[in-house]
């Protein structure tokens, strides 16, 4: 079969290594100095590794999309220079060490980030009690061992006939999957010995179930993934068995784990199986729905998926080396420049910035120091604008960036005199500092730079293009290691800000950062929050409001100010031990991972700001519309823009094609519900409805879910509002009513992080396979083919390139063991080979049609006598 497919490919003469234009195979030769590995203390140089590297336009490697345990070898932007072919292997490319440029934003993982973290403590009754940090993985393993003991007790009790066959099937398939993930031969045989009686029982008593089980085993080394994906389990079969047969009390940490992750057995799965299941759970044919618990209670648990995933990770390795562009290429500030301000050329005042016209139809902006603002803030904005202008092409930044002109001191009296005639003069006076001499930052920018993204004068087409630019640049720069933590002033509350741990700042993934929160909270004065948003029609603005990504991963001023409790681990469920005077908690392990949590929170925060901005635009444009279908059309299109923005973020961060990412997101969040919920809650229309009509409307926007409950009195013409003037998203001390947005945010960040972790497992297994094939690890033929089959299970769903790479290893294994039986694996790899052949043939014909079209266009421009058209009869 494989020989025939190869002949087909050879006949068409197509390079098999490039069926997917967004991905490329790379064999790297790192000839640099020794690089510290991300998962051990070992040092290595001159490392050659096969890998699959998603690329940016132009061929530069995206470091964060490479497998985390391989990224130490791919912190570079490379140009392909040499090709080489391995026998029976994929076509590969060598990276030239002379042209590589280092990224500082590594996405590998390390043992820790910051040795200066404050000690883990829990404050009880004003007393700081030390917290004993108990790793997540240790507790998970303990519960799996208890489960295996319970299985043994079940078998010895001879009560299999009292358990539904579907549950026995779940146990059997999990044991087979667990055994296949086990590297210790003795433990593997012990697990298989537990599975054998279950299989014997099903084969004799439930032949139809046994047939289904065998079909799943033929398809995958981890058959439990596909069983759970296609069969909705109505209980946690592992915990149910533990409760039935484990009579000893669980430890406090085991109980905490069970309480937190009781909704699905997948939360107890080993890392390779969990990450593979998580990726497959987004597939269109998946019956898994994370919106509600299986008990159909009102609590969402999609955040639990993300939490369980993150607790399995190691801190992301992020450094800001001194030789990086960000450190060494910020230009000097021009303090000698002076701009001659004139009231005749003053266009308007925007916030604390004076805008002046120019003959070239651009705008010169004079940004004035605001109250309490240090001079360094304006300096940072100058430097960042200068840096991004210099590296705009390298970074692929699409925004129309401002051109910094100078920064210097001006008399406050001069500024007031020039601006006195403006309509916004009084507000301007309250914003600027009280000093006699004020620092100003002067820059030139296009007029669109001063048009906020929610400006109602834009049509939907222009808005969509502007949103795309902003989303692209936010995530491209996040990849580069530049974070914008103040895109908007989003607050959960303005009451008692200083006394709160979060200072009132809104947390987009609050369920992960605060154990007492189960859903997103109310957003205070949501339109006010994005009134001066740093997203403009031209792209990103106010570039000084940025931080290096290292600020998220260390106990920086930023993290200590807004996330102080996260750094100590003291906000988790804690168990006090009076005998020792200490406390312990399963979740204090988060303290070491706080940067990983804040990283995903930043992604969600960016997208939340996009949604609020779209909502502000929608309210302004449709508020006076009387045509209901036309009004709905606007909000429906805005919902499409939001979903597309999330898909674009996934594409930039992982390399997954945007169209596929959008399809996957729609499996987790309902775009129709999202459109109805945003239209309902982000306009004041609902404030005019009577109680019965309001309830009926909620049946529509929350179909299949409980309605949104609030006790606040609606303010006429506003809606839910604490201050009675500005609309809030949610009632006081209540959750956010935008439930589909919450699902969308979690679906996005989970897909991003889940893909990275799946890649980590894929490349870890790939190294194992290479060592087996090279003879470095001695094993038999069956173990070799089993290892290659496991690699196929860890390939990204829908990523044909990774699967084709695994196919090449399978062919190498068959060459290494030519007489070994492979019937158990051939059917899986024949599917990969057929898909590969189909893609290659389709690509060939696409290229042929494209070349023919281009040739026809060229011929049409030539004189008739020079045309190459065949004139034969």
Curated annotation (Swiss-Prot):
Residues 16-90, 851-873 are annotated as: Disordered. It catalyses: L-glutamyl-[protein] + L-glutamate + ATP = gamma-L-glutamyl-L-glutamyl-[protein] + ADP + phosphate + H(+); (L-glutamyl)(n)-gamma-L-glutamyl-L-glutamyl-[protein] + L-glutamate + ATP = (L-glutamyl)(n+1)-gamma-L-glutamyl-L-glutamyl-[protein] + ADP + phosphate + H(+). Its EC number is 6.-.-.-. Glytamylation catalyzed by SidJ requires host calmodulin and can be regulated by intracellular changes in Ca2+ concentrations. Also requires ATP. It comes from the Bacteria. Keywords: Hydrolase, Ligase, Magnesium, Metal-binding, Multifunctional enzyme, NAD, Nucleotide-binding, Protease, Thiol protease, Transferase, Virulence. Mg(2+) binds at residues 542, 545. One of its GO terms (molecular function) is nucleotide binding. Glutamylase that mediates the covalent attachment of glutamate moieties to SdeA on one of the catalytic residues that is required for its mono-ADP-ribosyltransferase activity. In turn, inhibits SdeA ubiquitinating activity. Also glutamylates related SdeB, SdeC and SidE. Glutamylase activity only occurs in the host since it requires host calmodulin. May also reverse the SdeA-mediated substrate ubiquitination by cleaving the phosphodiester bond that links phosphoribosylated ubiquitin to protein substrates via its deubiquitinase activity. This is Calmodulin-dependent glutamylase SidJ. It comes from Legionella pneumophila subsp. pneumophila (strain Philadelphia 1 / ATCC 33152 / DSM 7513).
